[in-house]
């Protein structure tokens, strides 16, 4: 009997438990369609299976599921409640399609029914003055070289944090100046990115900080055979912002570094199709089907202009005369900030 047949070895009278059917769904759907299925599986193992795992699938009601979501909402975990709802809706819809269930109890519910409407998309991007503070602030904290240079590389390459910390050393050809990321990204599209001199400085620093026998660009300090956890660089940003003598600028996240890079590309008049290629977003309209050009020369030119702009910012002696929010407005740090200066 095959492993799948063993999982699906129960009668067709509707007596299968949630746990039995969810194990099949994980194997046949979740593992095949999710880029990071382990995140979804962890959420199911923590919040769903302990509560309703042993209940017969055909006994699950909308009320019972809402009680499960409400536990998370009552704890203030709105995002997690919405994530669990989305997973449950996907699972019960699949179970209905497969015939394990006559009708999904969540078919008429929408994501906004759990915890209200989604929060609006973030709009935070760092100003020139804040980029200076971010870059030089990294040198003032007692953090690992991996975190310090990985965060800088996130900004310079406009990559998602996961794409940097899960990069392998053999993806980088420093002789040709290209990062061949392949399909290891959110959209699973094959992607290559030209590397600027400033980005190569970051990569060389990460190579120097990585044990020779590790395949990872940013290995974990606890086990060099594993990549650094995404939470590590996220925590660094939080520490720098929340410390008594912190950066002194408005809160931002690692993902906001990517938004900062994209906004910079626009300010440098980079054509939208080139910027989209750098971000690894699909082209718009019919171009997404017929335009197969790799755009590497155009991306190289755009990224070099972006890198030169960043270098001009970080080479400034201070942040006083760097642009901040509006023309003529300058950044004022609180006196307690480690980077506070007097004119």
Range-by-range predicted roles:
Residues 33-49, 61-66, 78-95, 109, ...:
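Non-catalytic DNA-binding core/recognition domains of DNA-processing enzymes
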Residues 14-45:
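Short, aromatic/basic-rich helix-turn unit that serves as a nucleic-acid recognition element
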Residues 74-87, 97, 101-161, 165-166, ...:
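Basic, Lys/Arg- and aromatic-enriched nucleic-acid-binding interface segment
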Residues 2-7, 59-62, 93-118, 321:
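Short, charged hinge/linker segments at domain and secondary-structure junctions
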Residues 114-125, 138-142, 162, 173-201, ...:
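Basic, Lys/Arg-rich DNA-contacting stretches centered on the C-terminal catalytic core
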Residues 103, 170-178, 249-251, 270-290, ...:
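Short, polar N-cap/turn motifs at the start of nucleic acid-interacting alpha helices
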Residues 132, 136-147, 157, 193, ...:
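Short, basic (Lys/Arg/His-rich) helix/loop patches that form interaction surfaces
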Residues 10, 187, 197, 201, ...:
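C-terminal secondary-structure termini that scaffold catalytic or DNA-interacting sites
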């Amino acid at each position: 009997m095959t492993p799948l047949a063993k999982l699906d070895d129960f009668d067709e009278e509707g007596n299968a438990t949630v746990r039995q059917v969810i194990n099949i769904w994980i194997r046949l759907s979740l593992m095949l369609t999710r880029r990071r299925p382990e995140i979804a599986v962890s959420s199911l193992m923590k919040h769903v299976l302990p509560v309703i795992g042993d209940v017969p699938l055909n006994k699950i009601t909308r009320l019972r599921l809402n009680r499960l979501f409400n536990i998370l909402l009552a704890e203030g975990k709105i995002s997690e409640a919405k994530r669990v709802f989305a997973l449950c809706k996907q699972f019960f819809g699949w179970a209905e399609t497969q015939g394990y269930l006559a009708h999904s109890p969540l078919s008429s519910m929408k994501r906004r029914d759990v915890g209200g409407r989604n929060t609006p998309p973030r709009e935070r991007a760092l100003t020139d003055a804040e980029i200076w503070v971010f870059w030089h602030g990294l040198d003032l904290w007692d953090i690992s070289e991996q975190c310090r240079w990985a965060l800088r590389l996130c900004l310079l390459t406009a990559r998602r944090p996961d794409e940097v910390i899960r990069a392998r050393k053999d993806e980088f050809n420093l002789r040709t100046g290209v990062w061949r990321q392949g399909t290891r990204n959110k959209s699973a599209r094959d992607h290559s990115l030209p590397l600027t001199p400033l980005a190569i400085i970051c990569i060389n620093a990460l190579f120097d900080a990585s044990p020779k026998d590790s395949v990872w660009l940013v290995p974990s300090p606890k086990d060099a055979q594993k990549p650094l956890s995404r939470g590590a660089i996220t925590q660094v940003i939080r520490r720098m912002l929340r410390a008594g003598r912190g950066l002194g600028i408005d809160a931002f996240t690692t993902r906001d570094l990517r938004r900062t890079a994209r906004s910079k590309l626009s300010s440098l008049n980079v054509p939208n199709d080139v910027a989209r290629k750098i971000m690894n977003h699909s082209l718009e309209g019919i171009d997404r089907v017929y335009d197969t050009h790799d755009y590497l020369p155009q991306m190289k030119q755009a990224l070099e202009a972006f890198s030169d702009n960043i270098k001009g910012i970080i080479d400034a002696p201070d942040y006083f005369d760097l642009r901040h929010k509006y023309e003529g407005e300058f950044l004022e740090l609180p006196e307690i900030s480690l980077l506070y200066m007097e004119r």
